[in-house]
């Protein structure tokens, strides 16, 4: 599915011409990503504006809608997180991560001596880190979709 997502992003971005003088280009929104328990990512073929400065810096980026409160200190529920596809992890940065074959979540990723921790960044103390240990074979079910590089709220977002 992720190859389809990234392939679609390339097709959409080929139609965008940042040098045209417009302040905004467009990137696809591929559905929701959990800020809580991992949920299935559903593909939604919509496009939404993004500042050209970001589009030039992250030409393969796409949006995922954040659903949940586990990252509410930095990503409000309902916002669009701009994801830059990558498989490399910078310790402590925020990533969209696939858990299993089609479930995904957005969390702060910490490298541990024995594995990886997916940490919430929430005002709600009931959200806890998920630790995946190298020895348990759990890391085989994790893959990085991309790093969160920016976010915006939809036009119809209610405060």
Predicted segments, located by residue:
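Short, positionally conserved secondary-structure boundary motifs
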Residues: 1-77, 138-142, 150-159
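Acidic/glycine-rich C-terminal interaction modules and beta/coil loop segments
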Residues: 54-159
